[in-house]
Amino acid sequence: MRNKLRRLLAIMMAVLLITSLFAPMVSAEEGDNGDDDDLVTPIEIEERPHESNYEKYPALLDGGLDERRPSEAGALQLVEVDGQVTLADQDGVPIQLRGMSTHGLQWFGEIVNENAFAALANDWGSNVIRLALYIGENAYRYNPDLIEKVYAGIELAKENDMYVIIDWHVHAPGDPNADIYQGGVNEDGEEYLGAKDFFLHIAEKYPNDPHLIYELANEPSSNSSGGPGITNDEDGWEAVREYAQPIVDALRDSGNAEDNIIIVGSPNWSQRMDLAAADNPIDDHHTMYTLHFYTGTHEGTNESYPEGISSEDRSNVMANAKYALDKGKAIFATEWGVSEADGNNGPYLNEADVWLNFLNENNISWTNWSLTNKNETSGAFTPFILNESDATDLDPGEDQVWSMEELSVSGEYVRSRILGEEYQPIDRTPREEFSEVIWDFNDGTTQGFVQNSDSPLDVTIENVNDALQITGLDESNAIAGEEEDYWSNVRISADEWEETFDILGAEELSMDVVVDDPTTVAIAAIPQSSAHEWANASNSVLITEDDFEEQEDGTYKALLTITGEDAPNLTNIAEDPEGSELNNIILFVGTENADVISLDNITVTGDRESVPEPVEHDTKGDSALPSDFEDGTRQGWEWDSESAVRTALTIEEANGSNALSWEYAYPEVKPSDDWATAPRLTLYKDDLVRGDYEFVAFDFYIDPIEDRATEGAIDINLIFQPPAAGYWAQASETFEIDLEELDSATVTDDGLYHYEVEINIEDIENDIELRNLMLIFADDESDFAGRVFLDNVRMDMSLETKVEVLERNINELQEQLVEVEALMR
């Protein structure tokens, strides 16, 4: 029996060892963002059309903030009003600040320009702007010159009479005490300031400037990308406090920021003001606490927490804000969006109304995230999407106004809420101009045109030289153009036309008029449909001798155009989706001295909804990693919601193997963020963790259009989105395809340029659920256009590591075997 057991264990050990080399994955729990509990009743989040309810949410309409600016309000302070601490002006009168936050200045720094700040102050009615200075994520630590953007933003805010929040954008990692926030010298030998020195430096440069508000820690959180995170509890708040209190004290003691407002974040992405408001707040007279929320993730509530509720049971963000207010703490919503917490989906505008009504009612100041043309719901401007839209320029131009079409739905909505006016969205239906000939007479017939039965004069109608010739117009001479004038003219109509034509969106009706000698011709029109049979023409439209041009055959031709004002029934039909099928038209035709004229190419032109051809992807299939695509499916790969490219994902052959393929091109006009125009592919995979893997590898092939891969580079970035790390964990390495060195690439038998890509992932935590893997093909000043192929995507490790893993697992299994044998004795 014992020998059989040994053999069984040996077999199991062998199987486990083999498995360990190829799939060292473990299950991990998803992080809890903490926004649901049963202690308060949440207001349900629903993705549905927006309906403003100003009777229910009257605080949305307050007429704006025109007089509540630094030039009038002066230095800010905190006062107590009816038991609630709130922001006030220099005279102690409560003041609310409303405006926008920039996105990361390292990515979208071009928003810092005179025209943009003027637009925000004047056209948007903002009295505050927030400057988001990231530290990691290729920002201030790696490019200390970004501080110049902060200086420029401060100056522009002052010039445009706005308060300005200097945001030390703690994000990745989530512990503000992490080494990256301590300052030092970067890899290029450049010195960058730590948090305390940074704020002291700004205060010294702008001593006691009433415009300035200092935000010390954007979002403390459990995010462990690039360093440690903090816990969502009292210990997490204590970590924030231990970071913030010395900076607050240093600013006050410096004499350069004696009374400036300071804002401090809280654990769980600044959703735990309740922790900050408890037993150990910041010791300061002018400190506020940060509130962050996204209306597609964080539910509102009409309730507050009952007394005695423990901190671990407080998870509704709005209730946390109410808790802080009840405890006498002032809060400032320095970041919020109409999307879900990751910046996508929605927009959730009904929920935004709930939140903004709460903020406005309680005089809580706010800045919206964010001033970017990035392809995410929370961005304020129209993004670049290949074949769909061009990115809005972050400099609005000398008129200092962005048109509504240049704003995203979020931007349009937030602008109205800053202004305190009704939100009236524009029609964003994609439209296209069109021009279509209805009657061309090229078939040798009159195409249904006959003398109308009510015509006061008789004429002959026939097809001559593929045009509709009308003979007998000698006495049809009413050419004054007024409505009462055309009734005496000849009437023709398409009574025998047996077709219909959809003219939805038509704005004009035009036709060629051909005569033997130039003259004046007058035509009035009454288009007809089954739903709109009659509406008198307002007038005839005239063309005169000067409008005609001689043709090669000696005749003369002019174009006569009838608008909806001339023919109201044209508009009636063209604007009725249920009655837009044209089935007849009556024309009243008069001439000054011509007996015969010909009509040709009767055409409608206008503007109608554009219905793009649907993108046909190959079958998605089940998520698989490794991904070899040999089953003919995409094995779960899809476009990320922020991808600027959404062309067809198909399975094609590359180098003798199935591969995932798509076509795309980078635009000639480049945004400052090279990710803004990038294809973004993502794969969601259950229980995806790094484990012992060291890199992600895949085969990448490119097949460029001729002369469209000659300059710049394609930079391949690798991202995971673990919930427990703030949905963002980026591999520090990238893989560059230098298009100027394309000739040195391996070329396959089928003529493709082949790259064996490896991206190191050892800086990604190895024991948390990663949720999804994303590949971003960024545009580094590239002219690339063509087709690309992706194959054999896998997580892998070096041979040395495989040996180490094998040895470790052998040891573990041997220990287990000893334990089993001991039990058998």
From Swiss-Prot:
Q: Does the keyword Zinc apply?
A: no
Q: What GO MF terms are annotated?
A: cellulase activity
What processes does the entry annotate via GO biological process terms?
Answer: cellulose catabolic process
Sorted alphabetically, which keywords does the UniProt record give? Carbohydrate metabolism, Cellulose degradation, Glycosidase, Hydrolase, Polysaccharide degradation, Signal
Reaction catalysed?
Endohydrolysis of (1->4)-beta-D-glucosidic linkages in cellulose, lichenin and cereal beta-D-glucans
> Could you say which EC number(s) this protein's record lists?
3.2.1.4
Q: Where is the composition biased (Basic and acidic residues)?
A: 607-621
User: What are the catalytic residues?
Assistant: E219, E335
Q: Which stretches does the entry tag as region Disordered?
A: 607-635
Enumerate the Gene3D superfamilies for this protein: Galactose-binding domain-like, Glycosidases
Top-level taxon of the source organism: Bacteria
Signal sequence, start to end: 1-28
Q: Which PANTHER family match?
A: ENDO-BETA-1,4-GLUCANASE A (PTHR34142), GLYCOSIDE HYDROLASE FAMILY 5 DOMAIN-CONTAINING PROTEIN (PTHR34142:SF1)
Q: Which family does it belong to?
A: Belongs to the glycosyl hydrolase 5 (cellulase A) family.
The name this protein carries in UniProt is Endoglucanase C
Q: What is the species of this protein?
A: Evansella cellulosilytica (strain ATCC 21833 / DSM 2522 / FERM P-1141 / JCM 9156 / N-4)
